[in-house]
């Protein structure tokens, strides 16, 4: 077996999508990316450094391109150990709310969970149209409709309410 990306198990995303936004859970995909091959009018290979990874960001977000493939830096590991790490990651994600969402919406604030801040502001269940703050995890917005506008309006409302109640600007 190969080890290094087990933390991604259970995240509802394609490899290209998770690289595009430097996704992850506890760790980020950038920690195991060697290079990314893209098409932006021509085929190019970007090194990890050229991808300019940061929190929920990569170069691919700044340029119009398709991610063709990704080379990962993985290491050989006992398959049973890899399997256990995957099971642990899946178990940790078993509490993630079901439904159509983009995962966590806001960054944590100074080490405090954005979900806890939103919950403390009394916003679990807040709705705009068919988008609502999950009752299971307040940093998830579930969209049962087709309108992204509902989600954007709800995000704006959450930011305003959290700022009013706590003086915190969620990002």
Roles of regions detected by a PLM:
Residues 39-171:
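Phosphate/pyrophosphate- and phosphate-bearing ligand-binding catalytic cores of soluble enzymes
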């Amino acid at each position: 077996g190969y080890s290094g990306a087990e933390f991604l198990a259970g995240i509802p995303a394609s490899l290209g999508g998770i690289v595009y936004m430097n996704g992850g859970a506890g760790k980020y995909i950038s920690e195991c990316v060697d290079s990314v091959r893209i098409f932006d009018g021509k085929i190019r290979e970007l090194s990890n450094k050229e991808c300019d990874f940061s929190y929920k960001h990569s170069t691919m977000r700044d340029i119009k391109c398709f991610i063709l493939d990704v080379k990962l830096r993985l290491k050989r590991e006992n398959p049973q150990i890899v399997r256990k790490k995957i099971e642990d990651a899946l178990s940790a994600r078993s509490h993630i709310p079901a439904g159509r969402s983009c995962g966590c919406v806001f960054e944590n604030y100074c080490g405090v969970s954005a979900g806890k801040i939103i919950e403390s502001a009394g916003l679990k269940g807040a709705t705009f149209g068919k988008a609502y703050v999950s009752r299971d995890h307040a940093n998830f917005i579930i969209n049962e409709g087709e309108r992204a506008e509902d989600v954007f309006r709800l995000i704006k409302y959450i930011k305003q309410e959290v700022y009013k109640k706590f003086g915190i600007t969620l990002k």
